[in-house]
């Protein structure tokens, strides 16, 4: 009699564990059937200490970051994000953050913002599924406060960006309007598996194919595109995948994606680190702060 009871108890525990796993994973995807809208009337909590009108930058780099990524931000400030002049062109870097429920992290970011003057922030929860809000916040900032920028790059905190090579290629391209480049994704489909990080429901996006877009790990566009995307954004169906949302805006604007170079220069899947190799690329994903510092000290 003891054995059947033990087996029944074991089965019950397995079922209970499976149910707990299911509901915990479901709760990690808060956007499954929720509708979020980018609110243009939300005020900025933090603005960077800069004046684009006096010294219009050639390239503005907008880096999505989180409160826990202080080490990444510090490494970027010491390497590719350091304000400087490349080939006579001024480059400026700013970090995009939302808010956190942690009072300690909020205080740390407040101090960091006062110290470095390079943080842009609005009042939305800083989670992965709010990347569209975060990206549009950066684009809005360019539209409102830095429309004089010749080019803008949106990228992430775990990226290597070769700003010298990027500047060189942009100067050779000689394009100043309606320009958008990056790692082109021209034939992508929505992922309908509920447990995927990139799950998109039919109610959020009913179509079977995405428009052309560039990987959100790093894309570059002419300054005028920031205002055009910002102005059209409220008339475009909202989607939590920020790179797809920007692609939808570009489709509405009839702006075509372009290759920056005849050879691959954007690597969203990462590359094995090599100083020589990295001198001829623009962007590489999955780069740790130590690797950035090693490259700049080489």
From Swiss-Prot:
Residues 1-7 are cytoplasmic. Disulfide bonds: none annotated. Its EC number is 2.4.1.-. GO terms for biological process: lipid metabolic process; protein O-linked glycosylation. Residues 29-298 are lumenal. Glycans are attached at residues 130, 174, 231. It comes from the Eukaryota. GO terms for cellular component: Golgi membrane. It is found in: Golgi apparatus membrane. The chain crosses the membrane at residues 8-28. Its main location: Golgi. GO terms for molecular function: N-acetyl-beta-D-glucosaminide beta-(1,3)-galactosyltransferase activity. InterPro entries: Glyco_trans_31. It is a single-pass type II membrane protein. Pathway: Protein modification; protein glycosylation. The keyword Transmembrane helix applies. It catalyses: a globoside Gb4Cer (d18:1(4E)) + UDP-alpha-D-galactose = a globoside GalGb4Cer (d18:1(4E)) + UDP + H(+). Keywords: Glycoprotein, Glycosyltransferase, Golgi apparatus, Lipid metabolism, Membrane, Signal-anchor, Transferase, Transmembrane, Transmembrane helix. Pfam families: Galactosyl_T. The keyword Iron-sulfur does not apply. Catalyzes the transfer of Gal to GlcNAc-based acceptors with a preference for the core3 O-linked glycan GlcNAc(beta1,3)GalNAc structure. Can use glycolipid LC3Cer as an efficient acceptor. Belongs to the glycosyltransferase 31 family. This is Beta-1,3-galactosyltransferase 5. The lineage of its organism: Eukaryota, Metazoa, Chordata, Craniata, Vertebrata.
């Amino acid at each position: 009699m003891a054995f059947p009871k033990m087996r029944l108890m074991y089965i019950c525990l397995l079922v209970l564990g499976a149910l707990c796993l299911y509901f915990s994973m479901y709760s990690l995807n808060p956007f499954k059937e929720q509708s979020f809208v980018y609110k243009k009337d939300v005020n900025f909590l933090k603005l960077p200490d800069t004046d684009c009108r006096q010294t219009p930058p050639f390239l503005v780099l907008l880096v999505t970051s989180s409160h826990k990524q202080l080490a990444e931000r510090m490494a970027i400030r010491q390497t590719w994000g350091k304000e400087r002049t490349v080939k006579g062109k001024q480059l400026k870097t700013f970090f995009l953050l939302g808010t956190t429920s942690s009072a300690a992290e909020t205080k740390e970011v407040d101090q960091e913002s006062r110290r470095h003057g390079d943080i842009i922030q609005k009042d939305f929860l800083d989670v992965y599924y709010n990347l569209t809000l975060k990206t549009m916040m950066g684009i809005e900032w360019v539209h409102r406060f830095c429309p004089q920028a010749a080019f803008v790059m949106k990228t992430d905190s775990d990226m290597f960006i070769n700003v010298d090579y990027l500047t060189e290629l942009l100067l050779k391209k000689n394009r100043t309007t309606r320009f958008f480049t990056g790692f082109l994704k021209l034939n992508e489909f929505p992922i309908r598996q509920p447990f995927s990080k990139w799950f998109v429901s039919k109610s959020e996006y009913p179509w079977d194919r995405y428009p052309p877009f560039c990987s959100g790990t790093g894309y570059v566009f002419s300054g005028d595109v920031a205002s055009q995307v910002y102005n059209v954004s409220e008339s475009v169906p909202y989607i939590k995948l920020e790179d797809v949302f920007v692609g939808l805006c570009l489709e509405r604007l009839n702006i075509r994606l372009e290759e920056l170079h005849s050879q691959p220069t954007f690597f969203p899947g990462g590359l094995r680190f090599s100083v020589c190799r990295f001198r001829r690329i623009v962007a590489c994903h999955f780069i740790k702060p130590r690797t950035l510092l090693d490259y700049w000290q080489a």
